[in-house]
Structures are given as structure tokens and as C-alpha cells.
């Protein structure tokens, strides 16, 4: 059975997405990228951009399931902004009635590298290896989203 998995790495400035398609043990990369919002734009407008662009990603790819990185608290100011963007993401996913799977950063690192405290490069190398890419996926937020999608595939 074919299954499309959308991985999301929520953020306000840059929201990463990655879409993979799985069939049995076969894995195919369909798309990846970022939804970017301008820094000097009103927060409401930035959230609206995420809302509209994520709807477009969902309508284009029509995933069966969405895997999303759980919110990680590290700097209060940034965490609040990410939480606002994440709220919009969850709203859009609910509107599309999509099942959601959430993973912590440590779970994602462990699934891809075997080490829950792996660095970003190790995770990107694992993503590139699993998806047979010639180079590391960029930008970082898109690579992180692919890592989330792959984690969902590994955990099936």
C-alpha cells in the first residue's frame, strides 16, 4: 500500500516540510522545502502566510499522515514564536482531518542515527543516505522536516 508522509519542522521564520512516499520497503522523495516569512512583517501576517502556504502544500501532496517535531523549549522568546506558528500548523492539519504523529528531537535523532544526541550534520547525512541524495538536503529546516518524515516511516 502506498503511503505519503509529510514531515514538518515548525518555525515562524522558516517552516520546513518534506514529503516522502512509501510502498512496502520502497521509499521515494517527492518534495521538500520551506515556508518562509519575512522577518520585519507583522506577526499576524506571518502566521497567515504559514496558514495559506501550508494549505497549498497539503492540497498539492495530499499526505496520508503528518509527522511533526514536538516543541522544544530552549529560549523563551523564540519558543513562544515557534509555538504560535505550531498552533497555526495544527489548525491547518485539523482542517484537513489528517492524522498527526509527534516526535521529540531526541526521538528523531535516535531513529536516524542510533544516537539521541546526534548533531545536525549526522542527521542530515542520515537523511541523504536514506533518500539516496547526492548532497545534504538544504535548507536546514527542510532537512529537519525530512528527518521527521523518515522517523515516521521507520516507526511504522
Swiss-Prot record:
Binds 2 Mg(2+) ion per subunit. Mg(2+) 2 binds at residue 69. It comes from the Bacteria. The keyword Lipoprotein does not apply. Its EC number is 3.1.21.10. It is an enzyme of class 3 (hydrolase). GO terms for cellular component: cytoplasm; Holliday junction resolvase complex. It catalyses: Endonucleolytic cleavage at a junction such as a reciprocal single-stranded crossover between two homologous DNA duplexes (Holliday junction). Its cofactor is Mg(2+). The RuvA-RuvB-RuvC complex processes Holliday junction (HJ) DNA during genetic recombination and DNA repair. Endonuclease that resolves HJ intermediates. Cleaves cruciform DNA by making single-stranded nicks across the HJ at symmetrical positions within the homologous arms, yielding a 5'-phosphate and a 3'-hydroxyl group; requires a central core of homology in the junction. The consensus cleavage sequence is 5'-(A/T)TT(C/G)-3'. Cleavage occurs on the 3'-side of the TT dinucleotide at the point of strand exchange. This is Crossover junction endodeoxyribonuclease RuvC.
Amino acid at each position: 500500500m502506498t503511503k505519503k508522509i509529510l514531515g514538518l519542522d515548525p518555525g515562524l521564520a522558516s517552516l520546513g516540510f518534506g514529503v516522502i512516499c512509501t510502498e512496502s520497503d520502497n521509499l521515494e522523495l517527492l518534495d521538500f522545502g520551506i515556508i518562509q516569512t519575512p522577518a520585519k512583517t507583522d506577526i499576524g501576517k506571518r502566521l497567515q502566510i504559514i496558514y495559506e502556504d501550508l494549505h497549498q502544500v497539503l492540497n498539492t501532496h495530499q499526505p496520508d499522515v503528518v509527522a511533526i517535531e514536538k516543541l522544544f523549549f530552549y529560549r523563551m522568546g523564540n519558543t513562544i514564536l515557534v509555538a504560535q506558528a505550531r498552533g497555526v500548523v495544527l489548525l491547518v492539519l485539523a482542517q484537513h482531518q489528517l492524522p498527526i504523529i509527534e516526535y521529540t528531537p531526541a526521538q528523531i535523532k535516535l531513529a536516524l542515527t542510533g544516537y539521541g544526541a546526534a548533531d545536525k550534520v549526522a542527521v542530515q547525512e542520515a537523511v541523504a543516505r536514506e533518500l539516496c541524495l547526492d548532497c545534504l538536503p538544504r535548507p536546514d529546516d527542510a532537512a529537519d522536516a525530512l528527518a521527521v518524515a523518515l522517523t515516521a516511516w521507520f516507526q511504522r
